[in-house]
């Protein structure tokens, strides 16, 4: 009879420690909703994609309700380039004419969304892909941007770029209650019936607020919020975040992410996390370990 080789004691002890450390967090979050904004390198690297899918499935299996909102900017840019269409950006936002919006819907609502659904389902989950147009989930409002000039501001038409006007969570609630994992593409529909591309961070934040989520998790390509010395700031209050924005410590592309998280907290979400999606099993490490791996934001 072939005998199984015994696990090395130190390795077995580490496994036991990880499981016991996770137990109180699993107990605390059971039955709660956690909204995860999925983007950055975690969507590009094959190993990280599978790691993320396993994390989401595990959350569901232990009784937590994950809701995934995803981006897809690089994928949109790649397809536009292949089609010979140049992307124009104004203050970080892609100018989106009707033809570009067709590509955005094709990439976000089709290619990217269905790839994520397939990844989760292959890991044993039951994911269902949605865009904000399904079940009238996301109502959008066209963004109108002004650019300061010497005399009067210039009004810039970004085309089919929107913000969240309202969210009707009925279809998401139905899926969660049916033990499915919703995967949402950030496309909304306006009062004019047109489709609008919406920043995925904003959609995730509003979704967390409307669903009365326990947590909002934003996956990024950085460790989290960094101090002036480059060290990770592991925990911040809203007041502390305001001060860091004011003194320039938080700057650039991190500001809209942080503001989105702050709005979610003010809207009733218990905590928000900005974490490094380049780390294997980042979601589990942030949720189920005492130390975490990113920046935890709290209302206090």
Curated annotation (Swiss-Prot):
Pathway of action: Amino-acid biosynthesis; L-arginine biosynthesis; N(2)-acetyl-L-ornithine from L-glutamate: step 2/4
Any single biological process term in GO: arginine biosynthetic process via ornithine
Compartment annotation: Cytoplasm
Keywords: Amino-acid biosynthesis, Arginine biosynthesis, ATP-binding, Cytoplasm, Kinase, Nucleotide-binding, Transferase
Source superkingdom: Bacteria
Keyword Heme: no
Main location: cytoplasm
A GO-annotated cellular component: cytoplasm
Enzyme Commission code: 2.7.2.8
Listed CDD domains: AAK_NAGK-C
Site (Transition state stabilizer) residue list: 37, 257
Binding site for substrate: 72-73, 94, 197
Reaction equations catalysed: N-acetyl-L-glutamate + ATP = N-acetyl-L-glutamyl 5-phosphate + ADP
InterPro entries cross-referenced by the UniProt entry: AceGlu_kinase-like_sf, AcgluKinase_fam, ArgB, Asp/Glu/Uridylate_kinase, Glu/AcGlu_kinase, NAGK-C
Keyword Cytoplasm assigned: yes
Molecular function per GO: acetylglutamate kinase activity; ATP binding
Function statement: Catalyzes the ATP-dependent phosphorylation of N-acetyl-L-glutamate.
Protein family per UniProt: Belongs to the acetylglutamate kinase family. ArgB subfamily.
PANTHER family hit by this protein: N-ACETYLGLUTAMATE SYNTHASE (PTHR23342), N-ACETYLGLUTAMATE SYNTHASE, MITOCHONDRIAL (PTHR23342:SF0)
Name of the protein this chain belongs to: Acetylglutamate kinase
Organism, as annotated: Methylococcus capsulatus (strain ATCC 33009 / NCIMB 11132 / Bath)
Gene: argB
């Amino acid at each position: 009879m072939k005998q199984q080789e015994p696990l090395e004691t130190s390795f077995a002890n580490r496994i036991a420690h990880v499981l016991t450390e996770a137990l109180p967090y699993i107990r605390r979050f059971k039955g709660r909703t956690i909204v995860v904004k999925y983007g950055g390198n975690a969507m590009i690297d094959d190993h990280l994609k599978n790691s993320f899918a396993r994390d989401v499935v595990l959350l569901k299996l232990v009784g937590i309700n994950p809701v995934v909102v995803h981006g897809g900017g690089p994928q949109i840019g790649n397809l536009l380039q292949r089609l010979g269409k140049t992307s124009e950006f104004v203050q970080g936002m892609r100018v989106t004419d009707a033809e570009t919006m067709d590509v955005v819907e094709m990439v976000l609502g089709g290619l990217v969304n269905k790839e994520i659904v397939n990844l989760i389902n292959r890991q044993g989950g039951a994911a269902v892909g949605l865009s904000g147009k399904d079940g009238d989930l996301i109502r959008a409002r066209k963004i109108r941007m002004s650019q300061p000039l010497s005399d009067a501001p210039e009004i810039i038409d970004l085309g089919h770029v929107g913000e969240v006007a309202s969210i009707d969570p009925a279809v998401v609630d139905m899926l969660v209650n049916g033990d499915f994992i919703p995967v949402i593409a950030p496309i909304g529909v306006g009062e004019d019936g047109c489709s609008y591309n919406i920043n995925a961070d904003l959609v995730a934040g509003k979704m967390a607020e409307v669903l009365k989520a326990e947590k909002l998790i934003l996956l990024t390509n950085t460790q989290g919020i960094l101090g002036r010395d480059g060290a990770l700031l592991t925990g911040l209050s809203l007041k502390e975040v305001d001060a860091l924005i004011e003194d320039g410590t938080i700057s650039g592309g991190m500001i809209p992410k942080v503001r989105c998280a702050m709005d979610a907290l003010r809207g009733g979400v218990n905590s928000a996390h900005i974490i490094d999606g380049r780390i294997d099993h980042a979601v589990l490490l942030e949720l189920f370990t005492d130390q975490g791996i990113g920046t935890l934001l709290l209302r206090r």
